[in-house]
Design a protein with these regions (language model features):
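Secretory targeting and sorting signals
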Residues: 1-28
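N-terminal cap/lid subdomain of alpha/beta-hydrolase-fold enzymes
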Residues: 70-146, 409, 420
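A catalytic-pocket lid/entrance helix-loop region that shapes and gates access to the active site
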Residues: 140, 193, 197-255, 289-319, ...
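Conserved acidic catalytic loop of the alpha/beta-hydrolase fold
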Residues: 152-155, 163-180
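Alpha/beta-hydrolase fold active-site neighborhood
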Residues: 250-398, 464, 475-478, 482-601
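Short beta-strand/loop motif that positions the catalytic acidic residue
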Residues: 399, 404-407
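Conserved alpha/beta-hydrolase "acid-adjacent" motif
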Residues: 412-417
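Catalytic active-site module of serine/aspartate enzymes centered on a nucleophile-bearing elbow/loop
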Residues: 434-499
C-alpha cells in the first residue's frame, strides 16, 4: 500500500501486484561486457564433497572486469540431492533481499525433486552474509539518509548489481563442480535469472521464472510506477452481477476518487481507498466495484467496511542499515523516469514532469496519497548510477534452453507484458494464472499447489506440463440490497417467493462471512471478528464462523454457526429473523455448499424451516 510516509511502499513495490511500471525514457544502448569466470578453480570448494547441507563462502572480485580488484566474500548454501543427483537447481527467492534465510521455504516448495536435484542458494553480494552493505541511520522514507548512505559507501556501491552478482553465482557453481543449472527465480530472482542467462549461457540448462521482472528497452529492471484500475474491470467483467452495475468499472472508480477528494470521508481516506482497489485480496476484488457504486448512490457502509480492515494492518519496516544492499540493486539495476546520468536536482525535475504529463497514479494524484514527488516518491533519486549495468543487455545471445514462465493477472506486470518481454528467449513458454498474484509457487490455496506441482514437474523433465492453474475462485458482487424486497430469490422448489427471498438473504449473509476465509486473503485472513455489514457480529474460529444477529441485508438478522473445511466445503445451521418475511417469525435454515468457486452462486442444498430444498448453481 502507498502511505503518506511510504512505510508500505517497499512491500508494495517489491512484493505486491498493485502497481505497474510505465515505460521510462529510452537511454543509450549498452553492450554486454564479457567477463571470464575461471572454468576450473585451483581446487574444488570443500562443500563439493559434502553429503549434507554445507554452508560456505567464496572470495570473488569486487569488479569482475578487473582482475586486480579487491576481493569480497559471497556466502552460499549447498544441499546435495538426497539420492543420486540428476541436476542442480540454482534458486533465488527475490527481494532483492538476502536469500539464505529462505532456504527452508525453497526446500518446501521444491520438496520431492530434491531427492534427485542438488540445491544451490547464494546470498547476492551486499546482502545477508555476502559482504553486506550497511548504512547506519538509513531510512528509505528520508531522502537525505539515502544520499548520506551513497556517500558513505562511495564508489564501491556501483558493483553491487545483478550483472556482478551472477558472476559470483557462476563462480560458486564452478567451485562446487556442478553442471549446468536449472535457475529457479522468484520475483526479483527472475532478474538474476535473466542476467545469468545473458552472461553465462553455458551454465544454464533451463529456467523457471515466477512473477517476472520485466526489463526496459535498455535492459534495466522496470519498477512499478503506474496504478492498475484496469483490474477493476477485469474482475467485474467475469461476473454477470457486476456487469449489471451502472457504468464502467474504471470510470465509476474515478468518480469515487473525485467525490472523496472533494468531500473527504474520515472513514475512507484516499490512502485507504488506494489499498481497497487491490483486487489481489479476494474480498476486495469481490466487493470493491459494488461498494464504489453503492457509495456514489448514498450507501457508504460497504466501502467503509472494506477500508476499516486496513486499520492497524502490519507493514514492512523500511529502515535499518541493511537496506543499503536493497538500494544498491534497486537503483543500479532499475529503470526510472529520469536519466541515469542526471544529478539529483535534474532527476527530480524529470520525475515531476513525468508525473504531470503521464499521471501514472491516476485516478489519484501523488498529493491524494500524501506523497511529494520531489521528496518521497522514488528512493533512487539520490543514488548515483555511473556504471552501465543492464540486467538483460539488448542484443545478448540467450541460450536455447527450456524456460517456463508463470504470471498472474494481478501481478506487478501483466501476463501479456511478461510474455512480450521474454520473447527474447528462444524456447520460453508463458503460463497465465487467472486471478493469480505474486510469488505464485509460494502461495496458498489450489493455485499455489498447482504451480508448485508444475514447477516440480518442469524441474524434473524440463517440459512445460499440461493443465491449467487458476486462482479465480469467486465472482464479483452486484448491487448491495437495501431491503429484503431487493434480494433475488433462490429458485428452491417447494418454497414460495417470500421464503425464497429469506433463504437468499440467509445465504448471502453466510457467504459474506465465508468470503473472509478465502485462502488467498491477506488482510481479511487475519480477522478474528468483524461487525456484520448492516449490524450484528461475525466471529472467526478455527474452521468455524459464528454469526450473532449478523445482517448483510438490512433488517435480516442471522445467527448460528458455519463449519468450513480446509477443502472449502461449507455447512451452516442458522436462525433467520427477517422483517417483511411471510409470517414475521424466525426460520431455521440448514445450508451446504462448496465455497470459493468461480460461480455467481454455487449449488445449494439444505432445509428451510424443516423443508428440504436444492438449488442448482448459477454460473
Amino acid at each position: 500500500m502507498i502511505s503518506a510516509t511510504l512505510t508500505g511502499v517497499v512491500a508494495s513495490l517489491a512484493l505486491s501486484a498493485t502497481l505497474l511500471p510505465a515505460a521510462p525514457p529510452v537511454q543509450a544502448r549498452s553492450s554486454l561486457e564479457r567477463v571470464q569466470v575461471r572454468s576450473s578453480p585451483e581446487e574444488p570448494h570443500e562443500c563439493a564433497r559434502a553429503v549434507a547441507r554445507c554452508d560456505g563462502t567464496l572470495a570473488v572480485p569486487l569488479d569482475w572486469s578487473d582482475s586486480s580488484s579487491e576481493r569480497i566474500e559471497v556466502a552460499f548454501a549447498w544441499i546435495p540431492a538426497a539420492e543420486r543427483a540428476t541436476g542442480t537447481i540454482l534458486a533465488n527467492p527475490g527481494g532483492p533481499l538476502p536469500a539464505l534465510p529462505d532456504v527452508p521455504r525453497i526446500q518446501q516448495v521444491l520438496d520431492p525433486v530434491l531427492d534427485h536435484q542438488n540445491l544451490l542458494v547464494v546470498d547476492p553480494r551486499g546482502l545477508g552474509e555476502s559482504s553486506p552493505l550497511l548504512c547506519p541511520g538509513l531510512k528509505l522514507t528520508e531522502p537525505d539518509t539515502i544520499a548520506a548512505c551513497s556517500a558513505h559507501l562511495g564508489s564501491r556501491a556501483r558493483f553491487f548489481t545483478a550483472d556482478q552478482a551472477v558472476h559470483d553465482m557462476e563462480a560458486v557453481r564452478r567451485a562446487l563442480g556442478a553442471g549446468p543449472v536449472t535457475f529457479y527465480g522468484n520475483s526479483y530472482g527472475t532478474a538474476f535469472a535473466q542476467a545469468y542467462a545473458a552472461r553465462h549461457p553455458e551454465g544454464l540448462a533451463a529456467a523457471f521464472l515466477d512473477s517476472t521482472m520485466v526489463t526496459s528497452a535498455d535492459g534495466y529492471a522496470l519498477w512499478p510506477m503506474r496504478s492498475r484500475p484496469d483490474l477493476l474491470g477485469l474482475v467485474c467483467d467475469r461476473s454477470r452481477a457486476c456487469r449489471a452495475l451502472p457504468g464502467d468499472a474504471r470510470r465509476t472508480y474515478a468518480r469515487l476518487v473525485a467525490r472523496l477528494r472533494e468531500h473527504p470521508d474520515p472513514e475512507v481516506p484516499l490512502i485507504a481507498l488506494r489499498s481497497v482497489e487491490r483486487v489481489n485480496e479476494p474480498v476486495f476484488g469481490r466487493e470493491v466495484n459494488a461498494a464504489a457504486t453503492a457509495y456514489l448512490a448514498g450507501d457508504p457502509e460497504p466501502l467503509r467496511r472494506l477500508a476499516r480492515v486496513l486499520a492497524g494492518a502490519p507493514s514492512q519496516p523500511v529502515e535499518g542499515a541493511e537496506w543499503a544492499g536493497y538500494l544498491a540493486y534497486r537503483c543500479g539495476d532499475g529503470s526510472f523516469p529520469f536519466d541515469r546520468d542526471a544529478d539529483p536536482a535534474e532527476r527530480l525535475d524529470q520525475l515531476e514532469r513525468y508525473h504531470l504529463r503521464e499521471r501514472p497514479l491516476a485516478p489519484y494524484t501523488p498529493a491524494d496519497l500524501g506523497l511529494d514527488v520531489r521528496k518521497s516518491l522514488e528512493f533512487c533519486v539520490n543514488w548515483p548510477t555511473p556504471r552501465r549495468s543492464p540486467v538483460l543487455p539488448p542484443g545478448a545471445a540467450l541460450p536455447d534452453v527450456p524456460v517456463m514462465v508463470v504470471g498472474g493477472d494481478f501481478d506487478t506486470h501483466t501476463p501479456a507484458e511478461v510474455g512480450a518481454a521474454l520473447r527474447v528467449f528462444p524456447d520460453a513458454t508463458l503460463v497465465r494464472v487467472p486471478f493469480g498474484t505474486h510469488s505464485l509457487a509460494w502461495g496458498g490455496g489450489e493455485a499455489g499447489e498447482c504451480v508448485r506441482a508444475a514447477l516440480r514437474s518442469f524441474v524434473t523433465d524440463r517440459r512445460v506440463p499440461q493443465g491449467r492453474c487458476t486462482a479465480e475462485n469467486y465472482r464479483a458482487l452486484g448491487a448491495f440490497s437495501l431491503s429484503l424486497a431487493e434480494v433475488a430469490p433462490v429458485p428452491a422448489a417447494g418454497l414460495d417467493a417470500g421464503r425464497r427471498r429469506v433463504l437468499a438473504a440467509a445465504f448471502a449473509t453466510a457467504a459474506d462471512a465465508v468470503a473472509r476465509r478465502n485462502p488467498y486473503n491477506l488482510f481479511h485472513g487475519r480477522l478474528t471478528e468483524q461487525p456484520g455489514l448492516r449490524g450484528g457480529r461475525v466471529t472467526f474460529g478455527n474452521g468455524t464462523i459464528t454469526l450473532d444477529e449478523a445482517a448483510f441485508v438490512p433488517r435480516v438478522a442471522v445467527s448460528g454457526q458455519i463449519a468450513l473445511t480446509p477443502q472449502g466445503r461449507a455447512t451452516a445451521s442458522l436462525t433467520v429473523l427477517a422483517a417483511g418475511s411471510p409470517d414475521g417469525r424466525a426460520y431455521g435454515v440448514e445450508l451446504a455448499w462448496e465455497a470459493f468457486t468461480a460461480q455467481e452462486r454455487p449449488a445449494l442444498s439444505g432445509t428451510f424451516d424443516g423443508r428440504h430444498f436444492e438449488a442448482r448453481e448459477l454460473r
